[in-house]
Amino acid sequence: ELQQLSKQYSNIKLLQLDVVCENSIKKVVKEVEEIVGDKGLNCLINNAGINVLASLEEVTAETMLTIYETNTVAQLMVSKAFLPLLRKAAQLSTGMGCHRAAIINMSSLAASMQLVQANEMFLKVYPYRIAKTALNMITRCLAADLKSDGILCISLHPGWLQTDMGGNMAPMQVQEAIPGILSVLDRLGEKENGSFLDWQGETLPW
């Protein structure tokens, strides 16, 4: 589907990235820099993620570390690598938001510590939800650290979607969530910096 879109729209550039490979990250940063030039990068969406079903009885240290590396550590390393391009974009505008410079970390409702009991269906995904909770802390740290640069950072729950990871039991198709997600991104401003939002723009509890 992406290849078809890139053929239809010349402004869509497809780049391959392995988020857990430092050399791959460096390569993609250079490729993006060649595309955006002096304008910098306005919006980085950290969307990579993996999941393995693992209850308390099934979870292993190896599984925990594998999920944590991809869903948490890699998001921070990718954000760090793209900082020069984000800062370059931030210098060309004012205010806060995707129109200037923003980091969007794709999180999950499963990461909410306050809603653990309300979301018992997620209890069998220890590695995933713990990694996403840690990702939310990265969001908070980046939001505070980069505020002076004019770079916004939020965590976004896109909804439970029918994807390879979400499965066929998910209540929504990707096409249903995209308009809401784009609307949320378009409305982001300083007051949303460091927040945890869902695809409808509602604030979620940490």
Model-derived regions: residue spans:
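Conserved hydrophobic beta-strands of the Rossmann-like cofactor-binding core
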Residues: 41-45
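Short, flexible catalytic-loop segment of classical short-chain dehydrogenase/reductase
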Residues: 112, 158-164
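Conserved Rossmann-fold cofactor-binding substructure of NAD(P)-dependent oxidoreductases
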Residues: 20-38
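Rossmann-fold cofactor-recognition segment
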Residues: 6-23
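Catalytic loop of short-chain dehydrogenase/reductase
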Residues: 50, 55-68, 73, 83, ...
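A conserved hydrophobic alpha-helix of the Rossmann-fold in NAD(P)-dependent oxidoreductases
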Residues: 2, 25-29, 166
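Conserved mid-core alpha-helix of short-chain dehydrogenase/reductase
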Residues: 24-27, 74-81
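C-terminal helical subdomain
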Residues: 148, 155-158, 167-206
